[in-house]
Amino acid sequence: MTQYTPMIQQYLKVKADYQDAFLFFRLGDFYEMFFEDAVKAAHELEITLTSRDGGSSERIPMCGVPHHAAKNYIEQLVEKGYKVAVCEQVEDPKTAKGVVRREVVQLITPGTMMEGRTIDEKENNFLAALTHFEDGSYALACNDLTTGQNTVTLLTGSVEDILLEVYATGSKEIVVDSTFSKDELNKLTETLKMTISYEDTTTIPEGLEHLVKSVSQAKLIKAIGRLFNYVIRTQKRSLDHLQPVEIYYTNQFMKIDVHSKRNLELTETLRTKEKTGSLLWLLDKTKTAMGGRMLKQWMERPLIQKEKVEERLEMVETFVNDYFLREDLKEKLKEVYDLERLAGKVAFGNVNARDLLQLRRSLLQVPAILEAISLLDNAYAARLIQGADPCESLTELLGRSIQENPPLSIKDGDIIKDGYNDKLDQYRYVSKNGKTWIAELEKRERDITGVKSLKIGYNRIFGYYIEVTKANLGALPEGRYERKQTLANAERFITDELKEKETLILEAEEKIVQLEYDLFTALREEVKVFIPKLQHLAKVISELDVLQSFATVSEEEQFVKPVLTNKREIFIKDGRHPVVEKVLNGKLYVPNDCIMPEKMDVFLITGPNMSGKSTYMRQLALVTVMSQIGCFVPATEAVLPVFDQIFTRIGAADDLISGQSTFMVEMLEAKNAIANASERSLILFDEIGRGTSTYDGMALAQAIIEHIHDQIGAKTLFSTHYHELTVLEESLDQLKNVHVSAIEENGKVVFLHKIQDGAADKSYGIHVAQLAELPESLIARAKEVLAQLEGQEEIVIPKRVEVKVPEVAPEPVVVKEEPAEIQETKVETEEESQLSFFGGEQSSKKQDKSVLDAKETAVLAQIKKIDLLDMTPLEAMNELYRLQKKLKKG
């Protein structure tokens, strides 16, 4: 290292402490990067890679960005998941002896970004910290540095379950200890695209103990300690805005796993991963950024306490019924800026004058908001605004201190109002009058010399000067001016009087800028005192904003207030899928009832593809979520229980973590529901069993239905293409067949999208294929095959027709007609086994008893004794398999 220059040695010493980050090393007006950082940054930022002499035999790779544009480049790197360590000059180069002292003043990471393109105003930017304990449990702590919010919870389950919970927080960065499993870290980085950071210290940092007063569990404190120590180590500044830690337990809220949230498209769509088209998109009529964030948090955690849900519903009803109150509140909320993040910027020391002006404008709305809510005859409203301080003294302070149109920078002056500080007023008087004197001097000198083009100007290098063109130099009185600068076409002069005024004016202007900066930083410290009150106000206003949002969308979309019941019954009259209805944009939407009495647990849904089975299932889930976050629901009448969990298996399986097959993911999701559901849960299973053979799929589907019906008792919607399962209605007294109806008109299918009692009589799959515009020849052949199948007593494989195939294709398998006797059957492949479910051609022919041997006659006798009406389909299939095996033994 001694081979390098002192400056490069300094760089390498700092870089050694930040190996996992880009080091932005301040050199004058630039941030420079060297060595590998330079090569990688030049590629990522698309900037020029150059080199410089660093004292060694080889030149050092180097790239840099201007300090005034660094924010944009830092955002680009952090957006890609990188970390950036900002190293500043911490002493004046003019007075430095040797190399200027430099220190890292902040480590900017995906989880600690305070502002920029990556920060959505209606999204939290959580940093997560995960701590693993020997008993298999985990503590998960989260912090949003932009708002100061802190949460912690205790989790149990498999590592993959825990990682999915972390993923559900939306965190872009997770802090773990250095012993955390490398395999699990790979899943976080490669699959979930999270940035990994390390922190081994778990004690609560000094000065932050007051934030964990409500936390007594040692496990939770360790997770919070890890989180806080990482934040302090990386940010290196005041964290006065950090809020007391909120403990939450997953059993206090409706549990909806990550897969179910995605399937239901609660906050983003499955296809585009965007908000537009999700339930959040529909319900978000909030007027403030903080209200938008609270709405999303409510949707992530629906309530399970009936009384709390009813309180919200009553408040929403109040807003629905009082149009003028609601509209007045909305108008005031429009003028409220993001109090939470403004408080964070105050604490962080990066608030500017415009931010404080936004704070004042927001506070001006608060008294009227609180007064309007206080007049409501509502206990929930009274409790909500209790202790809310409108901070009128802060409003007054900001009103008399900050200019109405201040500049963005706090170092350019013109921030503080006249009358706020006497000394500042004096400097401004000198500066203003001095400039007036300059203008008067210019006029006087023109009159004395007779040179009308004479002017007095200023630049930063030469100060004030009198400028006369060379053509007019002869008109100047001898000895009146002292020459200062010669130009190509003019001369510049100075006088003793002008020098004196210049000193006064420049000193005043310099002192004005410095004094304004000092006054602003002092003002910022005064505002810090109000941070807890501002954060409390933010919570109150956020909640009011969400409630008015529910009221607004409920009135616009004609939602109805649900009635919550302690009974296990569902009564939804004319229910609608709220998002589908909105997207149809005025087109006729077909509503559907969902009526499940206390003794009715399972709806077995059959019907055509594309008929609306999945929409109907999602519709019920969304209605329950909307109800339990306190919103009205899309129906003409709704009576609902309070569900503790929702489990779904709808649509294409989307495995976030393990890389399992689609069928395995389907089975794991089914297992999750079966293992964790209670009689207070809602289960939605769509086409379980499709990913395996027909026998296996049908057997699994029936076994799952029976288990839910007999052992769990959860309200369940189970859609299937296995029409054979509809006979379960005869043996399972709490199961009911329903179907989505369709009719045929002029050879075409018309989907009615209406749920009706009973099983569907046909699938209309060929009609769906026509809608997909499959080749007409293929459709014609499918219809021919279908006609042959439907014309037989049993399902059989129809005769093949000769089809021309490419020469490279294998020869077609031809079904050979055998004599009308039971043939010896070889062990079948999986494909053959699936085909054999439909039977061979010989199965449709009557057997000639004369050719049966004794064993076959005995089997026939056993078949005659079987009481099919007393067997489930699964038992029947097992019996058939046993008899077939007996025949094969020969």
Curated annotation (Swiss-Prot):
InterPro entries: DNA_mismatch_repair_MutS, DNA_mismatch_repair_MutS-lik_N, DNA_mismatch_repair_MutS/MSH, DNA_mismatch_repair_MutS_C, DNA_mismatch_repair_MutS_clamp, DNA_mismatch_repair_MutS_core, DNA_mismatch_repair_MutS_N, DNA_mismatch_repair_MutS_sf. SUPFAM superfamilies: DNA repair protein MutS, domain I, DNA repair protein MutS, domain II, DNA repair protein MutS, domain III, P-loop containing nucleoside triphosphate hydrolases. NCBIfam families: mutS1, PRK05399.1. ATP binds at G607, P608, N609, M610, S611, G612, K613, S614. CDD domains: ABC_MutS1 (cd03284). The gene is mutS. One of its GO terms (biological process) is mismatch repair. Disulfide bonds: none annotated. Pfam families: MutS_I, MutS_II, MutS_III, MutS_IV, MutS_V. This protein is involved in the repair of mismatches in DNA. It is possible that it carries out the mismatch recognition step. This protein has a weak ATPase activity. It comes from Bacillus mycoides (strain KBAB4) (Bacillus weihenstephanensis). One of its GO terms (molecular function) is damaged DNA binding. This is DNA mismatch repair protein MutS. The keyword DNA repair applies.
